[in-house]
């Protein structure tokens, strides 16, 4: 879903021309992990190991974004080795874990990559994400985000976190930039 106004039909449903215009300029996609790349559930094993499920469609979308010159970064409040491993598998080199104040990592990324805030999209699911979301060019909430986050976002995915929402956002960015048909990734 998107805010009111003229819209463009996509395979995910209508997207406002305002959102598509913002998406044209995105050079960096920042993602939260729990509730965005995963469904927000954490499975704890008897020996203290932590397990999460990641969607391969999201992985494919991330690989397509990366091969289409859109940087991808992770800023997450929790810290887990399996997130490091997933990032390594996908080719994500900008990983910030254990971030209770996500603005610090956001500022570091802008400086490191020499990117303006209006060229950044951020995908979040909860209120901890809003301080960064309100500063970027395109703020995205997943379909099952916290109810207070949804009306604030520029775009709300049709798909829930951990179920392909990130792929939806990647496809949206690539479509807006005229790169969707040429995008090549690999299923991971």
Swiss-Prot record:
Binding site for substrate: 34, 55-59, 63, 78, 86, 102
GO biological process assignments: lipopolysaccharide biosynthetic process
InterPro entries in the record: CMP-NeuNAc_synthase (IPR050793), HAD-like_sf (IPR036412), HAD_sf (IPR023214), KdsC_fam (IPR010023)
Assigned keywords, A-Z: Hydrolase, Lipopolysaccharide biosynthesis, Magnesium, Metal-binding
Pfam (any one): Hydrolase_3
GO MF entry, a single one: metal ion binding
EC number per UniProt: 3.1.3.45
Annotated catalysed reactions: 3-deoxy-alpha-D-manno-2-octulosonate-8-phosphate + H2O = 3-deoxy-alpha-D-manno-oct-2-ulosonate + phosphate
Entry similarity comment: Belongs to the KdsC family.
Assembly notes: Homotetramer.
Record's function text: Catalyzes the hydrolysis of 3-deoxy-D-manno-octulosonate 8-phosphate (KDO 8-P) to 3-deoxy-D-manno-octulosonate (KDO) and inorganic phosphate in vitro. Also catalyzes the dephosphorylation of phospho-tyrosine in vitro.
Protein's name according to its UniProt entry: 3-deoxy-D-manno-octulosonate 8-phosphate phosphatase KdsC
């Amino acid at each position: 879903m998107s805010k009111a106004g003229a819209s463009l039909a996509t395979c995910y449903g209508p997207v406002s021309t305002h959102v598509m215009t913002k998406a044209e300029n995105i050079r960096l996609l920042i993602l939260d992990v729990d509730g965005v790349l995963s469904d927000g559930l954490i499975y704890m094993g008897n020996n203290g190991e932590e397990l999460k499920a990641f969607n391969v469609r999201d992985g494919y979308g991330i690989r397509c974004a990366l091969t289409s010159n859109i940087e991808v970064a992770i800023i997450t409040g929790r810290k887990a080795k399996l997130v490091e491993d997933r990032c390594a598998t996908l080719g994500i080199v900008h990983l910030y874990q254990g971030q209770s104040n996500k603005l610090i990592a956001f500022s570091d990324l802008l400086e490191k990559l020499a990117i303006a805030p209006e060229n950044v999209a951020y995908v979040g699911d909860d209120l901890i994400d809003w301080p960064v979301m309100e500063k970027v060019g395109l703020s995205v909430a997943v379909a099952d985000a916290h109810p207070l986050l949804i009306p604030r976002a520029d775009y709300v995915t049709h798909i829930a976190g951990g179920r392909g929402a990130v792929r939806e956002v990647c496809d949206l960015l690539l479509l807006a930039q005229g790169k969707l048909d040429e995008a090549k990734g690999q299923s991971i």
